């Protein structure tokens, strides 16, 4: 556990020394025993991603080095298992145009009075500013003239290197809602989410 803790400290400092779009997430996945005893084994799961595959690989190797260094500091051993490494999305303009044409045929959302009031409360309590229904987008944005790069690699972006793929971005919460925020969770359980 001490080595895992030291690794996490190292990775948290590493955040200042990687590209701005690099994201490093982790969790402990296997620790047991009472709180006053250092367990003999600990495991963490790291998820490293960015908008470019090369930056993801570089940051992943640096995270691995944090694990190796922590093992050296504590006189323990480390086993590293690389499960996957996501590439950036491969743009496909032809498929995007077909997809957009079909989206233009789809009905736009219509919100109930209850959903609009809920959105107003969320916007107010989460400090998002503005007022519903302006906070509830009901249209279709124009198709971008150039591909919009994703901030991070995903499983879909990996697939796009094997088969043609596009990704849809849809409004499913009040404008300005941060994704990793209680307001996003609250809206996911409501009709607007």
Model-derived features with residue positions:
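Midchain, well-structured core segments that form catalytic/ion-binding scaffolds
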Residues: 1-125
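Zn-dependent metallopeptidase/amidohydrolase metal-coordination segment
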Residues: 117-193
């Amino acid at each position: 556990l001490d080595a895992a803790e030291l690794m996490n400290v190292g990775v948290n400092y590493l955040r200042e020394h990687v590209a701005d779009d690099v994201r490093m997430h982790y969790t402990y996945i296997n620790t047991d025993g009472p709180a006053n005893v250092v367990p003999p084994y600990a495991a963490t799961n790291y998820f490293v991603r960015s908008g470019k595959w090369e930056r993801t690989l570089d940051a992943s190797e640096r995270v691995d080095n944090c694990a190796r260094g922590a093992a050296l500091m504590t006189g323990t051993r480390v086993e590293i298992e690389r499960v996957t490494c996501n590439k950036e999305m491969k743009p496909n303009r032809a498929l995007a145009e077909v997809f957009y044409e079909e989206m233009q045929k789809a009905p736009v959302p219509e919100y109930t009075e209850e959903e609009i009031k809920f959105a107003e409360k969320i916007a107010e309590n989460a400090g998002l500013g503005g007022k519903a229904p302006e906070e509830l987008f009901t249209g279709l944005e124009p198709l971008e003239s150039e591909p919009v790069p994703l901030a991070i690699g995903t499983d879909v972006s990996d697939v796009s290197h094997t088969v043609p793929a596009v990704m849809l971005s849809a409004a499913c919460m009040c404008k300005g809602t941060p994704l990793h925020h209680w307001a996003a969770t609250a809206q996911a359980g409501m009709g607007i989410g």
